[in-house]
Amino acid sequence: MKKIAYLIIAALVLLAALLFSLSSCSTSGQKFPESKEMILWYNKPAGDVWLDGLLIGNGYMGGNVFGRVHHERIALNESSFWSGRPHDYNDPDAFNYFDKIKKLVFADKFKEAEEMVNNHFYGMPVTQQAYQPLGDLLLNFSVTNDSIKNYYRELDMETGVVKISYTDGDVKMTREVFMSYPHHVMVMKVSADKPGRVSVEAKLRSHFTEEIIAQNNNLILNGTWKYIPERESWLIAKVEGTGMNFQISMSAIPENGKLEATDSSLIVTDANSVTFILTAATSFINYKDISGDPAVKCEKIMAEVKGKDFKELKSTHLKDFSNLMSRVHLKIGDPLMNDRPTDERVADLKNGLPDPELLAKIFQFGRYLLVSSSREGSEPANLQARWDEELLPNWGSKYTVNINTEMNYWPAEVTNLSECHMPLFHMLKDLSETGAKTAKTYYNAGGWVLHHNTDLWRGTAPVDAARYGMWPMGGSWLCQHIWEHYLYTGDVEFLREYYPIMKGSAQFLMDIMDFEPKYNWLVVPFSVSPEQGYFVDDNEEEMFLSSSTTMNVGIIRDLFPHCIEAGKIINADQEFGEKLAEALKKIPPYQIGKDGLLQVWIEDWKRGNEGHNMSANFGFFPGNSITLRRNPEIAQAIQKWLEPRQARTSWTNAWDICDWARLENGVKIDTVIRDFFHSRPPRLRRFLGAGRNTTPGTAAGPSIPPGMMRFGIGNNLHNSSSNQSDANFGFTAGIAECLLQSHAGEISILPALPVSWENGSIKGLKARGGFEVDINWENGKLATCVIKSILGNPCIVRYGEKIKTYNIKAGSSIKITGEI
């Protein structure tokens, strides 16, 4: 019956698509691209809704293009533009309380320990800084006809180009806009199919404007970040005075027509076309230094593109951007669905109508966001990747490292975007410096530590409150990304460069771990399990701090073996590796409680607020100290916990997909994917107090933005849960995990193929050990698989219960079928 219902729904969707294509609508007469595999398109502008805009970026900058006809807005961000200024968050008196807190925890006096942490073991201040909106480019167009026809707006994810077109009377107007990584500029061309019909006024604005200069064909906005007292959030530290300087610099290059500079704008009239070239820079040099000159930076960039026309700039951009995006292609579902506007398909998907082809787009959108927000030399992707319009973004749009930052980079290696991983590693170098001081100041330990959040200023001290921030494992988790990058690329020089960071994190843990008194296990002496509380006996008060958590055990079982193996590869630190190996014998085991679930803490306490975080599952995913076949009982305990679970945010749902993929359950994957997109009523934001404001220069009080804190995606495919990008990245990683796994020492093909994806193909996924994999399946079964070896390592292939070992020379490929 379910299959019949599915077929009926699919038939209705196809019928709707056919009727839509035959009907007269605002896009009639438009010529669509031949291939729309990576194209999102719409027949109306975005209006004022942030998640309706189309996102572009080059790592350094981000832009949200709304596509309005009369008054266009492109919201701008710059990766280093944050609130505040360089700051040391460490409390010099913290270590005086370390032993006292440890003794309280070891004596099961958890409430007293938590109070002491909150009062004496936190950062100064107890909150960090926030990512900030840079400003807006505003374009006021001269429109001659009240009735605009044939409106069309698209984002081509393969090229990173947004196109907008419409008919104004008898003239077709077209805009193209992209952000170029090679040239560090945003480029926009406005053109008409008849001469002399382009007239537009260009303005810049920002919350932090100090000066606007319009001269010749140049428009410059100079600004300085300053504290705005009308806006408050207890999750973002107040900083009196000013912070970094910045500049937005733009030039206008018209073809024919007239160009006039007013006091604060550029006006182009009666041109055939006009090309706008824009860049931005801040005074940020590094986390310790904001003495740079943004004007000099902008002048250098603009000088390098001077004389280059739109065609040349676009060509260079396409070579760079498409090289990354075209590496992977996922084809599932009916391509005829592409004849429907993306927003209509999103609405149907939220209502439960199947659309696998749209799921393929959402998979690619996660890759697109990573390419657009994380490039060599830029800051890493933060909670909102690169796109923020609020002065008080949710959770400061920081780097939350108890899951969110890591999830941002889960798809980097497996979906063939290793280069986009690099900004995270560069930040780790900074954090190992600031974290060394925190390790010494708070724990009198060597190595380095990072707790659950950091910001541009590389704060590493505990922040927010004990139940959130008393978790010294953030740096250790991030070190997993170093090892993963090595496993996928085989880059020994990279490993040699970053091994000291892994070692430093392990050294910190070795220095602080102690034997708890009840079981004599070696543990991190006090920590929370992120966002999960417990009840002791019949005590009605929820506790968070404990002497050992399963997540901490999982991270240690991840980091220590990686350090040992890395030391062998680079021929270093054999003695240190031996100490780690001895410590591994003394840490707590994974435990299954009386309810059959994987325990979260050292004791089998009653679970309190489940929160969002699936922390106890770390060893299963993204770690691999627990695997389905090596640890079947523990895997079963994880499955038992997942089965009744209803994820509370989109990013937790994305983690669910990854866990079910590791459980190789394609039936459940279908359900979890469907849940990912269902809209649900927003939950009250208990503590954010964030004001929403889209207009620079005006105040905003506390409010709950439309669509915040709910499941699903916006019309532009971005996660609509708190505007965070992590769920998009996590969804992409989860889909890749369904189709290919390589964490258990073998390449597993189609381990968790969603049952509704009967036919399809994936091209270009990467596997650990240095392999590139293409897979085709028919009727839910493997048809062909091509495995190319990059490094020449031995290759163990699994399909279901069939296993075979191949020796493939570097640069060579093998082709196998379901019989392998």
Where are these predicted regions, by residue range?
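Bacterial Sec-dependent signal peptides at the C-terminal "C-region" and cleavage site
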Residues: 16-33
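Acidic/histidine-rich catalytic neighborhood
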Residues: 504, 508-566
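Bacterial N-terminal signal peptides that target proteins for export
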Residues: 1-12
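Extended, hydrophobic alpha-helical segments in both membrane/secreted and soluble proteins
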Residues: 404, 471-485, 494-511, 652, ...
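Catalytic cores of secreted or luminal carbohydrate-active enzymes
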Residues: 122-144, 725-768, 772-773
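Secondary-structure transition/capping motifs at alpha-helix termini
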Residues: 193-196, 372-377, 485-496, 508-521, ...
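Aromatic-residue-lined binding/catalytic grooves and analogous aromatic/hydrophobic interfacial grooves
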Residues: 28-467, 473, 478, 482-486, ...
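C-terminal catalytic domain of Rieske-type non-heme iron oxygenases
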Residues: 385, 389-390, 522-524, 532, ...
